[in-house]
Amino acid sequence: MYIHSSRTVLARYGSRTPLLRPSVLGRYSTSPAATIEARKIALNRDNYIKSVYDRIAKIPPENYRNFSIVAHVDHGKSTLSDRLLELTGVIQPGDKNQVLDRLDVERERGITVKAQTCTMIFNDPRNGQDYLLHLVDTPGHVDFRAEVSRSYASCGGALLLVDATQGVQAQTVANFYLAYSMGLKLIPIINKIDLDAADIPRAMDQVESTFELDRENCLQVSAKTGLNVKSILPAIVDHIPAPDCDINSPLKALLVDSWHDPYVGVVMLLYVKEGTIKKGMKLLSAHTEGRYEVKEVGIMYPDKVPMESIRAGQVGYIVPGMKDPSQAKIGDTFFQYGKHEGLEALPGFEEPKPMVFVGAFPAEGSEFKVMDDHIANLVLNDRSVTLEKETSNALGLGWRLGFLGSLHASVFQERLENEYGAKIILTAPTVPYKIVYKDGTDKIVTNPDEFPGSDLRNQNVDKLMEPYVNAIMTIPDEYIGAVMSLCENNRGIQKELEYLTNGQVLMRYEIPLAQLVEDFFGKLKGCTKGYASLDYEDAGYKKSDIVKMELCVNGEPQDALTQVMHRSQVQARGKEYVVRFKEYLRFQLFEVAIQAKVNNKVVARETIKAKRKDVTQKLHAADISRRKKLLSRQKEGKKQMKASGRVHINHEAYQAFLRRTI
């Protein structure tokens, strides 16, 4: 029987009135009355958890339904999740909004960054049976595609959510094809029907024409008001298949996510494909061959709720007592140690591939060690970030971080500042370039400093290649000319142009990834007055005429400001950089030259004139020879100072310049 002592439950869940979610216990009174009340609360909570466990234990696997929500950014995924949690009794109506958006940055930006999960129990009034529903609230932005794909692996179907005011958008299309390719059963839902700007017939027509789904099967709801949301739960039961699983087979579990808990360490979220996981069981990793003992097992309801076990078809969490957080590799398969002989790992394990790299340095050099720990904790919670230590002559010790996209980098920086109060300097984003040598070997370069310089022949380089992406854009047809010009100015190649219903156009372009990370989306929004949407996927490498541009101050290259770009951009970008960097440098007692160099050739230059003292101030106007002598001596001194002097550039100058560059 599943029973905790009241002290254990009180310490875990706290002294708040027992609703449906555990909460953290703060300081409470130790008076006899308060102690009795706390014991009552703990007992009630314990009884409630037991009742949940008993209900789940009675539900057969054929009544399990694992599903996700497919949607564009800001189409209402998290709000719809809240309504479903309310209808199934997981949270109370009127409780805090966006329960599954737990990060501050998610609430502030109105986006989902980390895929969150929750178990629900739905009693179908049509037959009186209980159904175990497992919801995954996935990110909608393209940068977090890795979160989406691994979440779909644990699902049998998905809700295809379309905003009635905006219609089908680029990320809806991209996520649809990802879900469709993984065999998910899709239920089309038209959201935000309560708004005056809602055009329901248009949205239904787009669903039918773009996705070939019957418009008559579209459910019309308002997640904000709860209108008609009740119709979604029976549709999930009827149309999404039960997971293909076997409780009696040896254990196979897929690692869906992991995060760091300050009290218990690494927590792993697993989809149990076959078998059962129980407390005390020893697990074996298929990819790292590490062995771990299950310290705790349970479900997300929506916070952690301990259980005796989780069975095939369920998604739950375990505390494995893992000492090295890097061993938690997303997509890994876990077996029961001792019963793993002859078993094959589940498909889908793939190391995340960063698309954008930045150098990161503490604003204060003395904070490196503390910030190193903070970054390590964040990387554990977001395994798609790659981390290497690096050193800059200008900024000192730092890290080279790899991200899935520019928004991903921005969100990581914001989380670091919000959650740890850390101040960090990020260099301009760069993409991974490929250097192909004459002997047939190749090398991926993510740091501009490592990019080959002027003499490629002496370095045995055959060709240089840069990554391209297939960009999908949906825009109103009135902006088609402006968007085509934008794409061509960013070295884009048109692949497809399709007119959708009601004045929308779907455009596909092949664009260099380097152009995409330079605020391409911001420019796209600007030229379409905010009505455009964008998604993209990797299109491989292509040969390109790319060069390294160095920013030099008095001949000294500033490694933190080195960039790689296409040769056609060198003149304009070089002039812009030297003019802007000049703004942040202080006057010196000698002349300072700021130069942009490519292959040791100066392509742009700005000069900061020397500060000079008026050495002739005390002279009589008629003393010409003395005047010339003093000016000549001053000029000679300036020459010597320029030859031996070094320009001190403080961190604030780099920070201000890079802030505007990014």
Curated annotation (Swiss-Prot):
It is a peripheral membrane protein. Its EC number is 3.6.5.-. Gene3D superfamilies: 3.30.70.240, Elongation factor 4, C-terminal domain (3.30.70.2570), Elongation Factor G (Translational Gtpase), domain 3 (3.30.70.870), P-loop containing nucleotide triphosphate hydrolases (3.40.50.300), Translation factors (2.40.30.10). GO terms for biological process: positive regulation of translation; translation. InterPro entries: EF-4, EFG_III/V, EFG_V-like, EFTu-like_2, LepA_C_sf, LepA_CTD, LepA_IV, P-loop_NTPase. One of its GO terms (molecular function) is GTPase activity. Disulfide bonds: none annotated. Residues 62-244 form the tr-type G domain. Residues 1-28 form a transit peptide. One of its GO terms (cellular component) is mitochondrial inner membrane. Belongs to the TRAFAC class translation factor GTPase superfamily. Classic translation factor GTPase family. LepA subfamily. This is Translation factor GUF1, mitochondrial. It comes from Meyerozyma guilliermondii (strain ATCC 6260 / CBS 566 / DSM 6381 / JCM 1539 / NBRC 10279 / NRRL Y-324) (Yeast). The gene is GUF1.
